[in-house]
Amino acid sequence: MEEYKEIMQNKKGKVDVTPIANFFREEVKQQITKNCWKPRVVAFLTSDDQGAIDYSKWTKLACQKDGIEFILKRVERVDLEDLIIEANNDSCVHGILVYYPVFGGMMDSYLQDVVSPTKDIEGLSTQNRFNLYHNIRFMDGETATKKCVIPCTPLAMVKIIDNLGIYDKSLAMGEHLKGKTVTIVNRSEIVGRPLAAMLANDGAIVYSIDINGIIIFQSGKRHGTIKMSETNVTREEAISKSDILILGVPSPNYKVNSDLIQDGTIVINFAGCLNVDESIQEKSILVPTIGKVTIAMLERNLLRLFNNQISNK
C-alpha cells in the first residue's frame, strides 16, 4: 500500500492499520450494496470483561456502518449452548459470533463446535480448523463453490503482512514468503497455531513459542501439508534471526528485550498490551494493534458464509 511506502523504505516506524481495514470494509460494503444483500450476525456476550464489552461495541458499530445487521445478545453462559443451536437453525441468521472466554478450557472448545461450520464467522470450529491445517480451500470439496473461512485474527495478520509488501508474488503459490523467518510468541488454538500454519504454508520458516517450548512449522513435502519439528534453538536466538516477530502474550509484564530484535524487523503485536517497548519503532517496523483489520476479516468471513448459504437456495 502507498501509505506504508516510506516506512518500508526506511525499515522503521509505526504502522497504523486503518487503511488496510478500510480497504477490506469498503469491499464488503460495495458487495452488500451492489447485490442488495442483507446479511445478519447474532453475537453472544456472556462476560463482564471490559475488553470483551469494548470489542463487541466496536464490532457492532463497524458492521452496522457497513450494511450488516448485527444483533448483540447479553446472555447467561449456562444458556449459551441452547441459544447457539437456535441461531444455527434460524435461516435468517447468516453468522454467529461468541465472545470468548465463556467457561474457559475444553468447555469453550466444545462451544466452538456447537456453532455450525456454515455460520462460524470466526473459523474456530474443528471442521474449519481442520480445513486450514490441511490447506483445504472449499467446504464442498471438488464442487469448489463454497469457500472456507479462516480464523479472523490470524487472517488479519496475514493481510497486514501482505499489504506491507512482504509477500513476493513473483514466486509460485506457497512460496511467497520463501526465505523469511517468522517467530510467533503464542501457540493458542485460536491465533498462534493457525497463524504459524498459514505462514508456513506460504513458505516461511516459523518458530512457534509458548511456555512449553519451541516448535518449528514449515511447509511439508506434499503441497498443502505442514511439517512440525522440535528444535534446540532458544527463544532469544529465534527472535534475533526473525524477519517478522509476532507477539501475543496477554500480560503487561511480558516484554521482549529490544536488543534481541534486529534492525528492520516487522514487529506485530496482537495482545491487548504491548509486548515490546514502543521505542522499537526507532529501528524496526512496529504494528502495535491489529483489531480494526480483525473486524474487517470478520465482515469478510460473514459475506463468504452468506454467499455460501444463498447459493443453496
Swiss-Prot record:
Give the record's keywords alphabetically: NAD, One-carbon metabolism, Oxidoreductase, Purine biosynthesis
Keyword Metal-binding set for record: no
Q: Which reaction does it catalyse?
A: (6R)-5,10-methylene-5,6,7,8-tetrahydrofolate + NAD(+) = (6R)-5,10-methenyltetrahydrofolate + NADH
Which residues are noted in the entry as NAD(+)-binding? R187, S188, D210, I211, F270, A271, G272
Query: Annotated Gene Ontology MF terms?
Result: methylenetetrahydrofolate dehydrogenase (NAD+) activity; methylenetetrahydrofolate dehydrogenase (NADP+) activity
**Cellular component GO terms, alphabetical:** cytosol
Biological or metabolic pathway of the protein: One-carbon metabolism; tetrahydrofolate interconversion
Q: Which InterPro entries match?
A: Aminoacid_DH-like_N_sf, m-THF_DH_NAD-bd, NAD(P)-bd_dom_sf, THF_DH/CycHdrlase, THF_DH/CycHdrlase_cat_dom, THF_DH/CycHdrlase_NAD-bd_dom
Top-level taxon: Eukaryota
Q: Which Pfam families match?
A: THF_DHG_CYH (PF00763), THF_DHG_CYH_C (PF02882)
Q: What are its E.C. numbers? A: 1.5.1.15
> What broad class of enzyme is this?
oxidoreductase
Q: Which residues form the active site?
A: C152
One record GO biological process:
purine nucleotide biosynthetic process
Q: How does it assemble?
A: Homodimer.
This molecule's function is given as: Catalyzes oxidation of cytoplasmic one-carbon units for purine biosynthesis.
| Family designation | Belongs to the tetrahydrofolate dehydrogenase/cyclohydrolase family.
Q: What is this protein called?
A: Methylenetetrahydrofolate dehydrogenase [NAD(+)]
Q: Which organism is it from?
A: Dictyostelium discoideum (Social amoeba)
